Every structure is written in structure tokens, then in C-alpha cells.
Swiss-Prot record:
Domain Flavodoxin-like: 3-145
A single GO cellular-component term on record: cytosol
Pfam families per record: Flavodoxin_1 (PF00258)
GO molecular function: flavin adenine dinucleotide binding; FMN binding; oxidoreductase activity
Protein's recorded name: Cindoxin
The protein's role, per its UniProt record: Involved in the degradation of cineol (eucalyptol). The FMN protein, cindoxin, shuttles electrons between the FAD-containing cindoxin reductase (CinB) and 1,8-cineole 2-endo-monooxygenase (CinA).
Record key words, sorted: Electron transport, Flavoprotein, FMN, Transport
Binding residue positions for FMN: 9-13, 89-120
Native source species: Citrobacter braakii
InterPro entries: Flavdoxin-like, Flavodoxin/NO_synth, Flavoprotein-like_sf
Amino acid sequence: MNALILYGTETGNAEACATTISQVLADTVDTKVHDLADMTPRAMLDSGADLIVFATATYGEGEFAGGGAAFFETLRETKPDLSGLRFAVFGLGDSYYTTFNQAGATAATILASLGGTQVGDTARHDTSSGDDPEETAEEWAREILTALATPAVS
């Protein structure tokens, strides 16, 4: 199995979390980490990855950080068939704002609406909690490994 881990960041936290997620998954899964600013939906689909993990921070008024805005706008416009695509979302945000973790929720909604199948729950790291985002990412990645090992119930 192989996973493509994509991140959108302004301050570097999502990138650090993507690296942590990659390290946890690498015990079982071949991983590659890329900035969403350097990725297109077509390249994502052509990667052949069995799992796509998004680590995305909410920025400004609920927008995607970094290259996430352009990436997800292209997904909305082109509407590729994502059936057969498994994805997971690690969101970062600050509950001080009313748009807390909106980018992560929006990512999951877009991917599912195009036919993707979500693995595990969308993570919602809260900067205001004082919890280390990389520790939260590590715990969440272990949950994703467990979800991947559990057969789907139909």
C-alpha cells in the first residue's frame, strides 16, 4: 500500500504534521509528502496512491492555507470521479475563530461529494488547546492505521 500525503500551510505547522503522519504510516505504508502548492488534482489521481492524506490548516476567514485553495477550487471546477479513492483529513485551526477548522471540514466534504471514501474521522487540532499539533498528528495517524487494518462493514 502507498499513501500520498498533501499539506497546505502558511506557518509550517501542517507541513510538520504531514511529516509526522508520514513517519507513523511509513512502518506499514510507503509514503510520499508533497505541498498542495506543487500538486494538481490530476497529478494526485495519476500518483497511483491507495490513500491520500490531507493535512490542511484553516487560514484567514476559513480559507485553505497555502496551495490548498487553488487545489480544492480545481477539484470543485473539474469534478473528477473520485470513486475508489480513499482519503483522510487532518485539519488544523484555532477555536478562537468562528471558522475553526473549516478548511479540513470543507476538504472532507468536497472529496466525499466527488465519490471519495473517507478513512477515519477528520482530525480537528485546536491551536488554542495548547496541545502539540505533531503529537496530535501522531495519535491520529495511528488511528488511521487501525482504520486501514479494519475490514469495511457493508
